[in-house]
Amino acid sequence: MAPNIRKSHPLLKMINNSLIDLPAPSNISAWWNFGSLLAVCLATQILTGLLLAMHYTADTSLAFWSVAHTCRNVQYGWLIRNLHANGASFFFICIFLHIGRGLYYGSYLYKETWNTGVILLLTLMATAFVGYVLPWGQMSFWGATVITNLFSAIPYIGQTLVEWAWGGFSVDNPTLTRFFALHFLLPFVIAGITIIHLTFLHESGSNNPLGISSNSDKIPFHPYYSLKDILGLALMFIPFLALALFSPNFLGDPENFTPANPLVTPPHIKPEWYFLFAYAILRSIPNKLGGVLALAASVLILLLIPFLHKSKQRTMTFRPLSQILFWLLVANLLVLTWIGSQPVEHPFIIIGQVASFSYFNILLILFPMAGALENKMLNY
C-alpha cells in the first residue's frame, strides 16, 4: 500500500498531527473555539496590516494624512482600515474569553502552555499600544506620551529609559518611526510564540470541561472540531463585519480625528476599551510608582494563578463557591472597564479603588480560600 503523503511528508506530517489527526477530547465545548479564532484574528490583522503599511508614511508631518489618504483614495482602503482597527477589538474579546475559559476550567495547570499564553497577551498588548500611536491623532500622541512616561517612575534609570524609548526629549518623529517598526515586527513574534504555545499544548493534549483525563475517549480534530471551529468563526465574523461596516468608529475616540498637537491636551486622555481595566487600576493608586506596579501586577498576576490553585478538582464545573467568585471577578472587570473611561472625580475615584482592591482580593485571597473550603466540604 502506498504511504499516505499526509502522514509521510516532513512538513505535511506536522500539519497533520496538529490540525487533522490530532486526538481531541470528545466533550470540549464552544469555549474551546477561541484558540482557533485567535489564530484567524492574527492572520486577518497581519494581512490587513500589511496592506495598510503599503500606504502608510511613518513621519509626524505625513502620518495622519497618509491614513486619511488610505481611507479616501485607496481602493477599499476605508474597509481595510476599519477591519484592522476593529479586528484589534475582536482579537482582545477573543483573548479575554480564552483566558476566562482557562481560569474557569483550570487549564492553567498546564503551566508551560499558560505561561506562554501570558507572554502572548503581553506581546499583544504591546502591539496594540504601539499600533494605536501610528495614525498620529490627538489620542495617539497623548496616549503615547502618558503611557511611555510611566516608565519614568522606575527608580534611578526611569528618566533615561523614557528618553531612550522616545529617541529624544518628547514623543516626536523618532518615536513614531520606531513604533511603526515595532508594530510591523511584533505580530510575527506573536505568530512565533503561538507555535511554541501550541507545541506545549500538544504535549499534554487539551483540557476538557470535566477536568478529568480524556485519554479513554478521543476523537480526531478533523472533521469534528475543524467544522465546529468554522461555525465559531462564522459566528464571530457576523458581529465583526457588522461593526466594521455599519459603525466602524463606535469603539474609537473622536479625539483621534484631530491631528496630533503637542500644545493642546485632550480633556480626557484614555486608552482603547481593552486597556481600560488596567488603566482604572493604574489611576486608583494616588502614587506614580505604586500605580505603575499595580498596572503591571494586574496582568502579571496571571502567572501566579497556577500556584494559587488549592482545590482537589481541576475545573469549576462542580465548585459553586468558586463559580460565584469567578462571575464576581468578571463583573468586577466590567466595572473597572467602565471606571477607566470616566473622569477622575467623585464618585468614580472611590468606585475604582474598591474595584481594584476587589480584583486583587478575589484572585489572591478568595479563590484559594474557596478552593480549600470546597475540599473540606467534600468530606461531609
Curated annotation (Swiss-Prot):
Heme b b566 binds at H98, H197. The keyword NAD does not apply. The chain crosses the membrane at residues 34-54, 78-99, 114-134, 179-199, 227-247, 289-309, 321-341, 348-368. It comes from the Eukaryota. Heme b b562 binds at H84, H183. One of its GO terms (biological process) is mitochondrial electron transport, ubiquinol to cytochrome c. It is a multi-pass membrane protein. CDD domains: cytochrome_b_C, Cytochrome_b_N. A ubiquinone binds at H202. Binds 2 heme b groups non-covalently. Belongs to the cytochrome b family. This is Cytochrome b. It comes from Polyplectron bicalcaratum (Grey peacock-pheasant).
